[in-house]
Amino acid sequence: MKNRIVLFACLLLLTGLLVGCSVSVDDEIKNTTAKIEEAFNNKPMETNKSFESISYYLPNAMKIESEGTNNLIFEQGKQLYILFVNPNEELDSKVMFESTGAKTKKDLVFETFEDENRFGYVKVTEVEENSYEVLVGIGGIKLTTQAKASQISESAEQMMQIVSSVKY
């Protein structure tokens, strides 16, 4: 009987620690919106990579997986990122944003940002349990990945840094 009580107490303590230490999806969503807006408003990162007529900033932790016409695929650990650049669209274009479709019930984040010369956006959609599609764009530039709940805000911020840096 005493062993059961000790086991139950340990399980209860472990459950409390796991729940208390995990970041909630709601917190990640709040962080995502704030980080994206800040990254959009910050000075663009200096470009450090180029392919054909596109130059861009790529964080040191990311590697180039493949390069194709208007598409680049990056990898960070097991997470893939797909960058699409439409050089026919200006930085204030809304065509790519409108192609993402209207806001749905599955969208946890669906925000837009504007300044004098640019139109930016972020969309986070749950695709399955603990897996979210993160889409960040400015004008004719769009970067997409799938992330776990705990990676949403960090991924989105990094993505906006990349997208903001793209020159074509």
Each model region followed by its residue ranges:
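Bacterial N-terminal signal peptides that target proteins for export
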Residues: 1-8
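C-terminal motif of bacterial Sec signal peptides marking the signal peptidase cleavage site
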Residues: 16-20
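Bacterial signal peptide processing site
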Residues: 22-25
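Post-signal peptide N-terminal segment of mature Sec-exported envelope proteins
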Residues: 30-48
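Short, hydrophobic/aromatic-rich segments at coil-to-beta transitions
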Residues: 41-46, 70-71, 114-123
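Secretory pathway targeting signatures of secreted, lumenal, and periplasmic proteins
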Residues: 48-97
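Signature of long, low-cysteine stretches enriched in small and polar/charged residues
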Residues: 101-153
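Surface-exposed amphipathic alpha-helical segments
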Residues: 145-168
